[in-house]
């Protein structure tokens, strides 16, 4: 599984925590930790979130990565940017329940979180839940296909 992660300045510190936890999780599963690609930002210096949101969404849409993670102050801006890219189903999740539902029912391919909304501990649990949850298919498949054709 290849994952690409990006953030703006508000999400930088939580991104670092999530990245470390996911790399450790991938290594426990005997997966290559280099399958987690960080595209920035790389500091607390102010940046424009659309640049990073679009890059992550483009990677996922092109198949360069299977999934993405985007973190900004609220998660709202990143989710808006990502969902403008064809083929992206970005979900703004603030807890493990919404992360689980985003995967099970909506086959979300990008997880968005708000660094001013969740703690680093919550963000790690949300990300782990997102990546450990499979799409249920069935009746949800029809709904996701309908969404794709809008």
Task: Show which residues each predicted segment covers.
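Conserved small/polar residues in nucleotide/adenosyl-binding loops
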Residues: 148-150
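A short beta-strand-loop structural module common to alpha/beta enzyme folds
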Residues: 33-46
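N-terminal beta1-alpha1 ligand-phosphate binding loop
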Residues: 2-21
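Short, structured active-site "lid" loops
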Residues: 52-70, 74
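Charged helix-capping and loop-helix junction motifs
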Residues: 51-54, 93-95
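Short, glycine-/small-residue-rich phosphate/pyrophosphate-handling segment
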Residues: 96-142
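Short active-site oxyanion
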Residues: 2-3, 65-68, 87-89
């Amino acid at each position: 599984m290849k994952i690409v992660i990006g953030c703006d300045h508000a999400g930088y510190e939580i991104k670092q925590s999530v990245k470390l936890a996911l790399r450790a999780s991938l290594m426990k599963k005997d997966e290559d930790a280099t399958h987690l690609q960080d595209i920035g930002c790389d500091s607390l210096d102010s940046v424009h979130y659309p640049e990073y949101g679009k890059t992550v969404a483009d990677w996922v849409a092109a198949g360069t990565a299977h999934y993405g993670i985007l973190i900004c102050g609220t998660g709202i801006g990143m989710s808006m940017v990502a969902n403008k890219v064809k083929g992206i189903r970005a979900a703004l999740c603030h807890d493990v329940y919404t992360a689980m539902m985003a995967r099970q029912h909506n086959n979300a391919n990008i997880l968005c979180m708000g660094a001013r909304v969740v703690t680093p501990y919550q963000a790690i649990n949300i990300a782990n839940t997102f990546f450990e949850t499979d799409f249920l298919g069935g009746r949800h498949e029809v709904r996701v296909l309908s969404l794709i054709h809008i």
